[in-house]
Regions:
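Intrinsic disorder/low-complexity segments
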Residues: 66-71, 162-165
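Juxtamembrane helix-loop-helix connectors linking adjacent transmembrane helices
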Residues: 76, 80-83, 87-95, 123-186, ...
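Alpha-helical transmembrane segments and immediately adjacent membrane-interfacial amphipathic helices
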Residues: 45-61, 104-117, 146-157, 188-192
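Transmembrane helix-loop-helix hairpins at the membrane interface
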Residues: 1-39, 50-61, 66, 75-95, ...
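Alpha-helical transmembrane segments of polytopic membrane proteins
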Residues: 2-13, 43-45, 90-109, 176-189, ...
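Membrane-water interface of transmembrane alpha-helices
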Residues: 13-26, 102-125, 190-203
């Protein structure tokens, strides 16, 4: 429950910024003045990324100081661990990479405001389908830095350390189910608000923009078939990768097992992995982002968001699945993508459930 509350609190300022950005665009498109609301939008944006940049810079400075002062490192370690030996052992690997962690936080955070400049967005508009005058599009492209921060955080701490920390936490199945649904519902609602629901679009218009429709029997069949096909593609990828010496990363397997392994032991857990991720991620990525960011960039973001895989074979697999889902979105609609994504996850989950020795 505590983790879910924290997730909601972290999403709250992001909801506020996209809501204000949509209000600014609404006034602009209606011929009114949007400078005040746009200015307020960008001010909140600067506060969010400014705090991140300051925290990252502080961590970076502390890391530099600790390299020249052993006593400072020990004092900082004692402060964080509370004097416990086990906690100290868990924190020490993080402290060893504190400089990279700080840099990975402040550098993307400092870069994010650059996308608020119309001149920068004019150049981006040559590559992706955005309107450089739009406050919504300005916020959307700048929020890509959140994905970068998420990835650099994973790489800085290291998959091995994350796996160790995750294994030590041992969350209950109930809390995993609840937190996953909360996260994915927030993704879906954020996508709805981001494309103008509550401000520029009514409910039906928002669903139409996102490509969420009542699927036909043919679309359901195509979605399920695409999900099963994607499973086959990824299995072939893993076989080929292992044949050339690029197998699955042991730390990725450990981290995945600790994060979602408990869910694979029950049918409700497997259904949650399929339905929650299908609804939340597809509404955000294929529904909201792909029409503006395009197939390749959206698929890349989709892969990087799954930062628990670091940069490994699993990341490539997610990218390929993202491409398949993106092509499906271009040919059909987001609802079909939801079905395909859910079918893919549920199929993999059932394989792990029925044949645990294969994983």
């Amino acid at each position: 429950m505590g983790e879910s509350i924290l997730t909601v609190l972290l999403f709250a300022p992001l909801f506020l910024v996209v809501l204000l950005a949509n209000l600014a665009d609404k006034h602009r498109l209606e011929g009114g003045t949007a400078k005040t609301i746009a200015g307020l939008t960008y001010a909140f944006h600067l506060v969010i990324f400014g705090i991140m940049a300051m925290v990252g810079a502080t961590l970076h400075v502390i890391a530099i100081l600790m390299e020249t002062n052993d006593n400072l490192q020990q004092n900082f370690l004692d402060l964080l661990s509370g004097g416990g030996t086990e906690a100290t052992e868990g924190i020490l690997p993080v402290l060893d990479r504190l400089d990279v962690l700080g840099l990975g936080l402040w550098a993307p955070a400092a870069a994010a405001p650059l996308f608020l400049l119309p001149a920068v967005r004019k150049q981006l508009a040559r590559l992706i389908q955005i309107d450089f005058r739009s406050s919504v599009h300005a916020i959307a492209v700048s929020f890509v830095m959140l994905v970068v921060i998420n990835l650099t955080f994973t790489l800085a701490i290291g998959l091995e350390t994350l796996a160790d920390l995750s294994e030590a936490s041992e969350p209950s199945i109930g809390s995993l189910l609840f937190s996953l649904w909360v996260q994915q519902i927030l993704f879906a609602v954020w996508a709805m608000v981001g494309i103008g629901w509550l401000t520029r679009r009514k409910w039906g218009q928002a669903l139409e923009r996102l490509g969420l429709v009542v699927p036909s029997p043919a679309a359901i069949a195509v979605g399920i078939g695409t999900g099963l096909l994607s499973v086959g593609v990824i299995i072939v990828l893993e076989i080929v990768a292992q044949a050339v010496g690029w197998g699955l990363n042991e730390d990725v397997e450990r981290l995945s097992e600790s994060l979602i392994g408990p869910l694979l032991g029950s049918i409700p857990g497997i259904l949650t992995l399929g339905l929650a991720a299908g609804i939340g991620e597809e509404t955000l990525f294929r529904g909201a982002l792909q029409p503006r960011f395009g197939l390749l960039f959206t698929s890349l973001l989709f892969a990087v968001v799954h930062s628990q895989y670091g940069i490994t074979l699993s990341t490539l697999a997610v990218f390929i699945v993202g491409l398949i889902l993106g092509l499906l979105r271009m040919r059909f609609n987001t609802s079909t993508c939801v079905i395909a994504h859910a079918s893919y996850n549920i199929t993999l989950g059932m394989i792990a459930y029925l044949f645990p020795q294969a994983f």
